[in-house]
């Protein structure tokens, strides 16, 4: 527990560079359907996993949405003078657990644009994700979000903490 707290304390010191997110984590907020926390972990400069924990309201039902998406990024789709604007797309699976109204499991195809700032380890994104529910019955699902994430190098922070212990 002590080690985990120290890692968190040093995260701000070890922010990722805006030009290379490989191996870095982004933590932020998303507003939309669902609204909540967004975590993105880049495996390399084009592949990432996106994790969602949010609050969902659809058709008068409220509940928690938990999901994971695998994303591919295309940095050549749109160019910018400063920063980068990747188009990303992928596939994912989400679970909605409604208060007193059952659960919904659905597959989705996230499509989005992100603006990665050139001077800060921050991105701002817009995402649209159509999907198909398989539980409790087949139906169409639509997710959308606008949000932002701060990126940091967790491995660099962990090494720094271990050196101090």
Which functions belong to the PLM regions below?
Residues 4-13:
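Sec-dependent N-terminal signal peptides
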Residues 18-58, 65:
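Short glycine/proline- and aromatic-enriched beta-strand/turn motifs that initiate or cap beta-hairpins
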Residues 19-23, 45-46, 75-86, 101, ...:
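Short loop/turn motifs that connect adjacent beta-strands in outer-membrane beta-barrel proteins
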Residues 23-25, 31-35, 62-66, 85, ...:
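Residues that define the transmembrane beta-barrel architecture of outer-membrane proteins
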Residues 29, 33, 37-41, 68-74, ...:
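Residues on the lipid-exposed face of transmembrane beta-strands in outer-membrane beta-barrel proteins
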Residues 36, 54-60, 75-77, 93-100, ...:
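Sequence/structural signature of outer-membrane beta-barrel proteins
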Residues 63-103:
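Mid-chain, structured segments of secreted extracytoplasmic proteins
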Residues 67-70, 140-165:
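Outer-membrane beta-barrel "beta-signal"
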């Amino acid at each position: 527990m002590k080690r985990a707290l120290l890692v968190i304390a040093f995260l701000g010191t070890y922010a990722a560079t805006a030009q290379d997110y490989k191996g870095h984590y982004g933590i932020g907020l998303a507003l939309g359907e669902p609204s909540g926390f967004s975590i993105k972990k880049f495996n390399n400069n084009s592949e990432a996993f996106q994790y969602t924990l949010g609050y969902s309201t659809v058709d008068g039902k409220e509940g928690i949405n938990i999901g994971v998406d695998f994303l591919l990024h295309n940095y050549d789709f749109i160019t910018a003078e400063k920063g980068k604007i990747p188009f990303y797309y992928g596939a994912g699976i989400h679970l909605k657990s409604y208060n007193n109204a059952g659960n919904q499991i659905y597959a989705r195809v996230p499509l989005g644009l992100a603006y990665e700032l050139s001077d800060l380890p921050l991105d701002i994104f817009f995402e649209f994700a159509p999907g198909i529910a398989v539980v409790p019955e087949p139906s169409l699902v639509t997710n959308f979000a606008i949000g932002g994430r701060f990126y940091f190098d967790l491995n660099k922070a962990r090494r720094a903490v271990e050196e101090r212990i």
